């Protein structure tokens, strides 16, 4: 098997195990067997760190069921291959070149060298950040829910936020309410925002930061592009939300709501305000942000910030009539440009076609369905409230999109198709008019 096929199969196996565990009577509060479709949808959503749900996580699932969901989020967020290699390393067995190559593809690392060390860094950093996040959230939740329940909620939401999953346990207040009851708690909002950004920015960027500290000039081109693009994609949407969506209330409330919505829309799926109250332009902007998603080698899904940046730079190159796509005094390879174009095409076709099909099947407005499909393929988890009422056909479509968005479109294609043979000759070149 190729590395791409191993990645696909490993995610399939994790989803299957999660589905079977969630079907057990002990996983539901009613101690009844959960249907296979509902259990599988939840397992796919958790493994693919999305957050779309058909059963409210707090009121339907028992403590055991919630623990299974959290396990799927943790392994799915860090990567099945990452966790697998860590287990192999802990057992004292040697990690061969094939396993290293698979890990490289799994996290989009630039080279095989140092991949084992990077695996340890990913696991250690993830667990440390999640524990810090849980400790910071504990005062809020323990004060509201008591010590035992508060600690569990702190751990659950810290991992869910860092892994950009968007699963929450606040259905105890109102089903599918997410973090709306904490919309005015600036402290909690900031902690969740920082956890989301930390998980969505990518482990490769954090490795660069850990290695070179504040010496940004020594960062890799990818890290520079990711940091710059992420900053732009946080600030600009936040400004739009501030001036056009949250144009009432105090400055402090408008600022934190705008910033939270900008950050969570691209990757996480938490919400502190009513999304259905947004106008169509705001909904359209959120769809674009969800399609872009997080960064390469992160816990998030979507097209990725680096892909968006390469596409933008390619357009600038064409408009300025230059030959090479450039950024930070470096040339970007033609292969990266072609791959970015292919990813954009696959995501647009998949999300738009799926939205049309769901709209026809469910007899729902197209924009509402496009919001749902972009949320699924971007592994975000935001919804306008239609997920639980969808038919089996629409749910299957969403599951496919979630899986597509988590493992990556190119990974799926490369896993399905045989490797292309190298060609020693090239066909004659002929121009074709575009634009």
Model-assigned labels for residue ranges:
Residues 1-435:
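Membrane-proximal intracellular helices of multi-pass ion channels
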């Amino acid at each position: 098997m190729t590395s791409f096929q191993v990645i696909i199969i490993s995610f399939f196996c994790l989803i299957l195990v999660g589905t079977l565990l969630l079907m057990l009577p002990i996983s539901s509060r009613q101690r009844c067997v959960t249907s296979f479709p509902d259990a599988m949808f939840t397992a796919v959503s958790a493994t693919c760190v999305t957050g779309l749900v058909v059963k409210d996580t707090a009121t339907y699932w028992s403590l055991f069921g919630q623990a299974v969901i959290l396990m799927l989020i943790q392994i799915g967020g860090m990567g099945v291959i990452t966790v697998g290699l860590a287990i192999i390393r802990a057992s004292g067995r040697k990690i061969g070149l094939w396993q290293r190559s698979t890990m490289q593809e799994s996290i989009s690392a630039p080279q095989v060298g140092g991949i084992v060390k990077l695996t340890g860094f990913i696991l250690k950093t993830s667990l440390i950040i999640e524990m810090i996040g849980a400790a910071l959230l504990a005062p809020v939740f323990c004060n509201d829910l008591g010590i035992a329940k508060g600690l569990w909620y702190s751990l659950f939401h810290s991992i869910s936020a860092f892994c950009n999953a968007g699963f929450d346990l606040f259905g105890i207040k109102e089903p599918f309410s997410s973090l709306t009851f904490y919309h005015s708690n600036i402290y909690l909002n900031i902690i969740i925002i920082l956890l989301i950004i930390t998980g969505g920015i990518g482990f490769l960027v954090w490795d660069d930061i850990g290695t070179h500290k504040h010496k940004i000039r020594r960062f890799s081109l990818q890290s520079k592009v990711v940091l710059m693009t992420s900053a732009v994609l946080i600030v600009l949407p936040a400004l739009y939300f501030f001036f056009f969506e949250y144009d009432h209330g105090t400055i402090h409330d408008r600022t934190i709501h705008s910033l939270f919505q900008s950050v969570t829309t691209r990757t996480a799926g938490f919400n502190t305000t009513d999304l259905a109250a947004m106008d169509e332009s705001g909904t359209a902007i959120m769809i674009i942000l969800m399609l872009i998603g997080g960064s390469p080698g992160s816990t998030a899904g979507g097209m990725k910030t680096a892909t968006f940046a390469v596409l933008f730079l390619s357009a600038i190159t064409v408009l300025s009539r230059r030959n090479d796509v450039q950024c930070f005094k470096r040339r970007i390879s033609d292969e990266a440009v072609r791959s970015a174009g292919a990813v954009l095409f696959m995501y647009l076709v998949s999300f738009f076609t799926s939205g049309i099909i769901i709209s026809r099947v469910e007899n729902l407005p197209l924009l509402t369905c496009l919001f749902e499909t972009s949320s699924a393929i971007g592994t975000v988890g935001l919804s306008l409230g239609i997920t639980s009422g969808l038919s089996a056909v629409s749910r299957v479509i969403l599951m496919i999109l979630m899986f597509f968005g988590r493992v990556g479109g190119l990974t799926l294609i490369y896993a399905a198709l045989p490797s292309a043979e190298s060609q020693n000759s090239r066909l004659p070149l002929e121009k074709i008019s575009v634009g």
